[in-house]
């Protein structure tokens, strides 16, 4: 699976872009502010219906324009699929897959599985648990066909319970929600635990490859004490939850924590080491997806050389080539891409970008 064509209109400073893409490596070279990151952001938006940089769509639509439009052609073996997304300043979104509307963001996400490595992506390690839950849930969305339904049911029940907490005086009034909530909490948490066990081998292999000098360990916390019954905890914590206005334990508090030589990675690793660990995790998840689903995973890598020396850049390049995936890479100069461009030239295309305009190199 690869993105064979990409059309972008009025997305940030990208007024009109129409690219034929390489199924292997696509390099984008240009100065800061030229539109390199915006191009990766547009690809991400096409596959997720949201940005990895801003939650406010009006900031993404080009100045003095009313909407942005994204279109892509996906090639998978002998089949081709077209996807399109349009967003206006009123927040309305139109999705089309093969010309058919009334599609969901989940349909796009299924068609375009992708991993993103950006300077801001260190939040996977030094940010809040929400980023690590998203990491696990991405994997489960693509791995487990029932997970998306179970996860949405859990979110809906949590929202209803939190709203009911404000109006409820006695726990018996809340119990019907808790019976259902407990069921889906157990399902989601068990799914996450199984996924963690399955992907750990891939994580350990990549950590050894990128950070052999460190012992990296990972621990999954489900959001409440493992030996406790979740339904009992909900009942016992009713007064506390009612006083704060939300449910304080459960899968919405889950975390996937990492330690280096026994200490939290965010406390002891340098930014360069954190980036290498982030790369190890993203590659591990992509490689596990490829192995399980027999499909490619797109990798988006912004500012390839930042925080990494030449040797580490070459290590990252090696793993990306070995994955057999479609890769989009940005850099400020051609020099920064030498460690990755020097590996193979027969499966790569380079573009120069300036003021939102692309030029084939």
From Swiss-Prot:
Major location category of this protein: cytoplasm
One GO molecular-function entry: single-stranded DNA binding
Residues bound to ATP: 30-37
SUPFAM superfamilies: P-loop containing nucleoside triphosphate hydrolases
Annotated Pfam families: SMC_N (PF02463)
Top-rank taxon: Bacteria
Compartment(s) of residence: Cytoplasm
Gene Ontology cellular-component annotations: cytoplasm
Keywords carried by this UniProt record: ATP-binding, Cytoplasm, DNA damage, DNA repair, DNA replication, DNA-binding, Nucleotide-binding, SOS response
Protein's GO biological process: DNA replication; DNA synthesis involved in DNA repair; double-strand break repair; SOS response
Bilayer-crossing regions: none
Family: Belongs to the RecF family.
Role played: The RecF protein is involved in DNA metabolism; it is required for DNA replication and normal SOS inducibility. RecF binds preferentially to single-stranded, linear DNA. It also seems to bind ATP.
Name of the protein in question: DNA replication and repair protein RecF
Species per Swiss-Prot/TrEMBL record: Glaesserella parasuis serovar 5 (strain SH0165) (Haemophilus parasuis)
This protein's encoding gene: recF
């Amino acid at each position: 699976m690869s993105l064979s064509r990409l059309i972008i209109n009025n997305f940030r400073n990208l007024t009109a872009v129409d690219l034929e893409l390489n199924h292997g490596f696509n390099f984008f070279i240009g100065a800061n502010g030229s539109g390199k990151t915006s191009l990766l952001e547009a690809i991400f938006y096409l596959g997720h219906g949201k940005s990895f940089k801003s939650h406010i769509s009006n900031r993404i639509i080009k100045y003095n324009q009313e909407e942005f439009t994204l279109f892509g052609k996906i090639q998978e073996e002998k089949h081709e699929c077209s996807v399109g997304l349009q967003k206006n300043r009123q927040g309305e979104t139109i999705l089309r897959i093969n010309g058919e509307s009334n599609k969901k963001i989940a349909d796009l996400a299924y068609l375009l599985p992708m991993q993103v490595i950006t300077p801001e992506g260190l939040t996977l390690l030094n940010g809040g648990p929400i980023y690590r839950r998203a990491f696990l849930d991405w994997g489960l969305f693509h791995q487990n066909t029932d997970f998306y339904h179970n996860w949405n049911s859990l979110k809906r029940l949590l929202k209803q319970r939190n709203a009911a907490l404000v109006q409820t005086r006695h726990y018996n009034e809340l119990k019907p929600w808790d019976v259902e909530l407990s069921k889906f909490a157990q399902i989601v948490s068990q799914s996450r635990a199984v996924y963690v066990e399955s992907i750990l081998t891939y994580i350990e292999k990549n950590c050894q490859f990128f950070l052999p000098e460190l012992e990296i360990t990972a621990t999954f916390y489900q959001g409440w004490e493992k030996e406790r019954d979740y339904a009992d905890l909900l009942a016992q914590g009713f007064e506390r939850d009612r006083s704060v206005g939300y449910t304080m334990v459960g899968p919405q508090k889950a975390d996937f924590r990492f330690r280096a030589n026994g200490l939290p990675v965010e406390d002891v690793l340098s930014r360069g080491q954190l980036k290498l660990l982030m790369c190890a995790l993203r590659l591990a998840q992509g490689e596990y997806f490829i192995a399980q689903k027999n499909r490619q995973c797109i990798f988006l890598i912004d500012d390839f050389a930042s925080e990494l020396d030449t040797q580490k850049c070459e290590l990252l390049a090696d793993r990306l080539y070995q994955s057999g995936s479609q890769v989009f890479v940005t850099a400020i100069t051609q020099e920064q891409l030498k460690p990755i461009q020097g590996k193979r030239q027969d499966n790569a295309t380079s573009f120069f970008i300036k003021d939102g305009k692309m030029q084939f190199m």
